Amino acid sequence: MRSSDCGAVLAWSVKMHRWPVWASCIAYSILSLLRTSPIQTTSGDWAIAFCTPMIRVHGDMRRINLPEMSAEEVGNMVTSVMNDHQRKIYQQNLEVDFSFELPNVARFRVNAFNTGRGPAAVFRTIPSTVLSLEELKAPSIFQKIAESPRGMVLVTGPTGSGKSTTLAAMINYINETQPAHILTIEDPIEFVHQSKKSLINQRELHQHTLSFANALSSALREDPDVILVGEMRDPETIGLALTAAETGHLVFGTLHTTGAAKTVDRIVDVFPAGEKEMVRSMLSESLTAVISQNLLKTHDGNGRVASHEILIANPAVRNLIRENKITQINSVLQTGQASGMQTMDQSLQSLVRQGLIAPEAARRRAQNSESMSF
């Protein structure tokens, strides 16, 4: 079968922690494929694509030598790892997001979908061990943020920027240091936490609850100290998350925004005009921090590291949000390093000085490359 005749593409995107050594024989079974691929690897994102086999290494696509597959073969492989409920959603919606675990191998987050060539899927491995904030080389202010008794902490960035990994590390820090009740609401569950000093309950959309809003509404009666909302997708979920933060809970959430000011705007903009002033007031009182991040290839090419824009909601920031002067937040970021704040450009400069990324990589991602000095 020629590559151009291929009826489907199966892609596998994984986050790993040491270079893998591929087994010489990979069968036409997704379980065999995943089991024959060691997960003990260096930090990076990998992807495998069939019909035109490729693998993504730290953001770069590379071809690999794997057999081509028909649309029927790909479809059978994809549905073989679904349960009945996931298979039903896939058949009805033509796409589904879920996770599953191969014992003694890894957990995988899967997005199955359909294309003009037929069924397709993307698999991403979820490390069995949650990395610590130190292992992620996260700024020390992250620990202080995680120690907040209440408020809203938003981790934002584009898809694949490591938001889930950062949140998992912060939840793990709380779990290791505080006697707290931590409740997570995810779609799907990615990192599996074991209770340590804290009690952790993890709920998955469509498995343990019908919606984020339902789970958040119930959470207020489940006596949590910390609530993780996997995605803040709609006004109802965002409103309930703000209420939870206002009523004394520490709420973690994610948004696909780039930058603190854009994050504040996004939250306010999802509400009708008549509610925006009230939402700004709630956000000004409940916001603790906004962490916006991106991943960059390390200087040695053997991994990736995150750069962060960090906004701490001090009185000046709260006042700007309340008075709808969001554009002035960037000025506060530039002068707020004493309290742990930093702009993305300041973070990039720091990573260059630490020898973690190349100056050229920093300049490509900088908002104002001309002002950067190393």
Swiss-Prot record:
It is found in: Cytoplasm. One of its GO terms (molecular function) is ATP hydrolysis activity. The keyword ATP-binding applies. GO terms for cellular component: cytoplasm. InterPro entries: AAA+_ATPase, P-loop_NTPase, PilT/PilU, T2SS/T4SS_dom, T4SS_GSP_E_ATPase. May be involved in pilus retraction. PANTHER family: TWITCHING MOTILITY PROTEIN PILT, TYPE IV PILUS RETRACTATION ATPASE PILT. This is Twitching motility protein.
